[in-house]
Amino acid sequence: MLTFDDFDAWGEAVRGADLRLACDGVETPQWRLAFRNVGAVVLQLGYEGGGNLCFGGNNHQGTLLWMPLGEPGHQVANCERCDHGSVLVIPPGADFCIQVRKRAHAWCSIALPGTIPAGDRGAASHVLHADPLNVRRLTSLITRAVSAPEVDLASPSVAEGLSQRLLAVASACLAQDVEPETTLGRPKIERMEVVRRIVTALDADPMGGRSIADLATEAGVTNRTLGRVFSDAFGVSPRRYVQLRRLHTVRRALRGGDPHDDTVARVLARHGIWELGRFAGSYRRQFGESPSDTLYRRG
């Protein structure tokens, strides 16, 4: 299992998804990640030392199933609060959002082969509410397969047998979808489209000086609706989400900088930031270190 003391470095190691991540509070400054290919399926197990506001897209050829581990209720996927039977189903090419506010948490995922009919390319992601017993069987099997080095997958027969067990349990989860008990806010397709438009705009110009009114206009909604959508999707206001994205953009630049040639002031200036003291205070509150600490530690 890979261990990281930096959230962004951990995020860059996550496989099979194009992610925009923002750390939301740290309980324990440690993030861990493990992967395992089992025949035609790809397993992933993640432990995060704090909260995470995530928007991403599935890069696998087949459907990706994401499931929270531990006690439910703290994880929100596609604006729906997760329970013991929640499975986030992400077809190939589909995007999704996940929020966990200000707490350490864990999750696992399984990428199915493209031949498994679990979601067509271009279809939207959605939260499936399956039998909790089947979901527990699947998460336990994934956790054991990834965490147990004694499982020898070099043997084709062992790998094939485990792959078939994983696919059988995953198929059992997909076969039953019960009505969700908790739905936050407005219809999820509309909300996801609003989130998608804002994230796309921020991807194009993460350090731009757009106002919240500008972003609402870009998404085709009112300021009030934009606020409700971001509260449902990420648990924060649009302004706070934009601030977090800006902080992480600068952090990545500092991590990739050369302390022999760069200074914090130059990096910030390249990102249109001139109020160095104010920004440094926000940066320290978010990451627990100063911008110069990041530049010199990563250099």
Regions found by a protein language model. Give the residues of each.
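N-terminal low-complexity or simple alpha-helical regulatory segments
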Residues: 1-61
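Alpha-helical bundle regulatory/interaction domains
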Residues: 1-26, 64, 73-206, 211-213, ...
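Short, conserved beta-strand element in jelly-roll/cupin
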Residues: 57-73
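Alpha-helical structural segments
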Residues: 244-249
